[in-house]
């Protein structure tokens, strides 16, 4: 499975499919017009709900199987289905890889009007500087494919869910490409991470075929409550860590002009002077480039107030940074 993913990734990069697919959806004059049309707009807004609800339903379904003699043999299959989406989609894709891979989205790269450099799928960059790899929305589309886990119980159900997931996940992937939010390889790896997670849980952790013939022995109610409380606590802790230790990156660039005979500058700022570095531009237009990185809650950012107020003989540059939201840590460099 890993070799297949690496081979597909190599082919996508060698043939230029990632950039070519984005070029197909991009218009230099309009941006990403396809992404604003239906059904792509609807899929972006509501497309994750079916997969999320099915994943959510897997936990109470597992408790039901634990207490039902008829469905007792299916308990581990149901548990694997739920955990694959929680671990693969929730933790590995959205909490770890997306936040730390540092791959800019198509709409953020220079080729499509952005300011960041394009990176290949496995060419990891600065954490927080782009959250393209893998595609989070796509994992919820492909999550139906995890139903292949039920092959031993019902081949019709398993194959139906698998192909439904492939179709729906591909549909979500196309929607995200049309919106300039993801490359094709981001969708491929969304499916890949889910299948890798499923394989580990199935073959190395739970091994459900070995438990099918076990006698019916329902878990005591007290033990079930403890287990359920433990799962809730673990999810609460992971959510807290995710939202407070989420990598953050934002930059600001601005070109400006100075009087030809200016020999000095006066800088007015609320940033520490140790954060500034002067770089010779070899005759190019003066430019200020501010980078901010750290850890912050979702939807947190900063606003940069840059101006050149008129003064006497010495040119003045005014640069102030205003934080919007909660930063657990923020380091700036100008």
Tell me the role of every PLM-derived stretch.
Residues 105, 140, 189, 275-277:
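Short hydrophobic/aromatic residue motifs in ordered secondary structure
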